[in-house]
Swiss-Prot record:
The gene is ZNF92. It is found in: Nucleus. This is Zinc finger protein 92. PROSITE patterns: KRAB (PS50805), ZINC_FINGER_C2H2_1 (PS00028), ZINC_FINGER_C2H2_2 (PS50157). Its main location: nucleus. Keywords: DNA-binding, Metal-binding, Nucleus, Repeat, Transcription, Transcription regulation, Zinc, Zinc-finger. The keyword Transcription regulation applies. It comes from Homo sapiens (Human). GO terms for molecular function: DNA-binding transcription factor activity; DNA-binding transcription factor activity, RNA polymerase II-specific; RNA polymerase II cis-regulatory region sequence-specific DNA binding; zinc ion binding. CDD domains: KRAB_A-box. GO terms for cellular component: nucleus. May be involved in transcriptional regulation. Pfam families: KRAB, zf-C2H2.
């Protein structure tokens, strides 16, 4: 027995067999081939890298390699070049050692038939297609099975029937459970494991079981944290070769997968497949529990967690349990306060790599996501998605309680608190609870002693620099946010954003009591309070309540004696209206 080579551990599929495989099976094949090659290298056996490995590392399909080889090589059939095609079929006479390879590109006339001699140079060339081949064979062995689809010629042996099945497209092996059909029995056997839940391969670290050894091998990397696949371009490391291959496309910018429907191009075939479902509206992934269908497998997986009660991954710090180990890992960072991802530009650190990636765009100033409708550009795809809803008027997030719809999920989350009355944000200093994180953040500043940001104009100090910046506008009366639609200017971006709704949406919030319409839900809420007599804004210092938040703020200034509006002459006022009057007089 000769030394072990890559050919001994290589698995080959016909085109039809390859087409029968789903994405997961193709990825498994790719990983197994790369793993086999790495093992040979580790043992010092493999010297040069086979073309198949180079091809797979680039994320390309093995059948594309065969097409590539056909362009570069002449189809030669001789035992010098193809002794290993059918080793079980021995042909003693050297004149009979004529092998016809799979070269669908070439016609019958272009095929070269070589008589087997001691040296390749001495081979006699025969031309003339199948007739020439038949002449080279004896009468007994000239029973040739021709495959017109891929110009394949076979000696009579058992695998011919198998080849015929591939080209007819028949899938004779059917699963009784689901009715799914397969080209090969081995594929059906693998598929059955899904139904039988046959998990033969168990992880000694966490006890999780798998139905394939290769899946267990991949899983073990989670525990070891090993990342053997490194990108030569940027140094980033990965625990799977397939992930490295996908990552490399970022550097090349290549987008070989184009949608025939709309012309949009993608760097991954899987992304194109997902995209196509937008046009077809296909939802192939169905939940067996409730019947709900989805267009992406990942969304179905997330949905399934609703039905799952089992949460095996528990946080030892707070007791919170999770269904997925990776989510537990991310959660733990909350307790440790660890921020392993640091920005080399400014030194700012983050607890998630995705947050660092988003942050980096601040330094580059890059805005790659452009709106086709108005030309406005954004530095994040999520921001572009939100922006597009201004043009479409889409409000995908609906409240099940009252039916009100919102453009953003975060706004819906805030809205739900109105119905529940929940106050999840509690101050550890004074015990006061808040419904919204923004209100809680503002409140915490009251307890902060350190207020390093001081206003040079009036001496007022602030704990946050952005608050000082906003405060300064009181003195300068600057209005940097200008509406392009009507020319009106504002001193705060939040007020400017609210104003823009007038132009984009009109007055969609109508009062059922008086018929008055408003462009903001907050204005409608304020109107309703007039009829109900409710006074939700209470001043804790004197227990006086108000029906408007602005009235509460005005009252607070009177109570504290603060005079934030300062004139050039030195006089200060507690109301902006009094300040305006003073300006007009001077």
């Amino acid at each position: 027995m000769g030394p072990l080579t890559f050919r001994d551990v290589k698995i080959e599929f016909s085109l039809e067999e390859w087409q029968c495989l789903d994405t997961a099976q193709r990825n498994l094949y790719r990983d197994v081939m790369l793993e086999n090659y790495r093992n040979l290298v580790f043992l010092g056996i493999a010297v040069s890298k086979p073309d198949l490995i180079t091809w797979l590392e680039q994320g390309k399909e093995p059948w594309n390699l065969k097409r590539h080889e056909m362009v570069d090589k002449t189809p030669v059939m001789c035992s010098h070049f193809a002794q290993d095609v059918w080793p079980e079929h021995s042909i003693k006479d050297s004149f009979q050692k004529v092998i016809l390879r799979t070269y669908g590109k070439y016609g019958h006339e272009n095929l070269q038939l070589r008589k087997d001699h001691k040296s390749v140079d001495a081979c006699k060339v025969y031309k003339g297609g199948y007739n020439g081949l038949n002449q080279c064979l004896t009468t007994t062995d000239s029973k040739i099975f021709q495959c017109d689809k891929y110009v394949k010629v076979f000696h009579k042996f058992p695998n011919v029937n198998r080849n015929k099945i591939r080209h007819t497209g028949k899938k004779p092996f059917k699963c009784k459970n689901r009715g799914k059909s397969f080209c090969m029995l081995s594929q059906l056997t693998q598929h059955k494991k899904i139904h039988t839940r046959e998990y033969s391969y168990k992880c000694e670290e966490c006890g999780k079981a798998f139905n394939w050894s290769s899946t267990l091998t991949k899983h073990k990397i989670i525990h070891t944290g090993e990342k053997p696949y490194k990108c030569e371009e940027c140094g980033k490391a990965f625990n799977r070769s397939s992930n490295l291959t996908k990552h490399k496309i970022i550097h090349t910018g290549e987008k070989p997968y184009k949608c025939e429907e709309c012309g949009k191009a993608f760097n991954r075939s899987s992304t194109l497949t997902k995209h196509k479902r937008i046009h077809t509206e296909e939802k192939p992934y169905k939940c067996e529990e409730c019947g709900k269908a989805f267009n992406q497998f990942s969304i179905l997986n997330k949905h399934k967690r609703i039905h799952m009660e089992d949460k095996p991954y528990k946080c030892e710090e707070c007791g919170k349990a999770f269904r997925v180990f990776s989510i537990l890992k991310k959660h733990k960072i909350i307790h440790t306060g660890e921020k392993p991802y640091k920005c080399e530009e400014c030194g700012k650190a983050f607890n998630q790599f995705s947050n660092l990636t988003k942050h980096k765009i601040i330094h580059t100033g890059e805005k790659p996501y452009k709106c086709d409708e108005c030309g406005k550009a954004f530095n994040q795809s999520s921001t572009l998605t939100k922006h597009k809803r201004i043009h479409t008027g889409e409000k995908p997030y609906k409240c099940e309680e009252c039916g009100k719809a919102f453009k953003q999920s975060s706004t819906l989350t805030e809205h739900k608190i109105i119905h529940t009355g929940e106050k999840p944000y509690k101050c550890e200093k004074c015990g006061k609870a808040f419904s919204w994180s923004s209100a809680f953040t503002k409140h915490k500043r009251n307890h902060m002693e350190d207020k390093p940001y001081k206003c040079e104009e009036c001496g007022k100090a602030f704990s946050v620099f952005s608050t000082l910046t906003k405060h300064k506008i009181i003195h300068t009366r600057e209005k940097p946010y200008k509406c392009e639609e009507c020319g009106k200017a504002f001193n705060q971006s939040s007020i400017f954003t609210k104003h823009k709704i007038i132009h984009t949406e009109g007055k969609s919030y109508k009062c059922e009591k008086c018929g008055n319409a408003f462009n903001q839900s907050s204005n409608l809420t304020a109107r309703k309070i007039i009829y109900t007599g409710e006074k939700p804004y209470k001043y804790e210092e004197c227990d006086k309540a108000f029906n408007k938040f602005s009235t509460l703020i005005t009252h607070q200034i009177i109570y504290t004696g603060e005079k934030p509006c300062k004139h050039e002459c030195g006089r200060a006022f507690n109301k902006s209206s009094n300040y305006t009057k003073e300006k007009l007089q001077t």
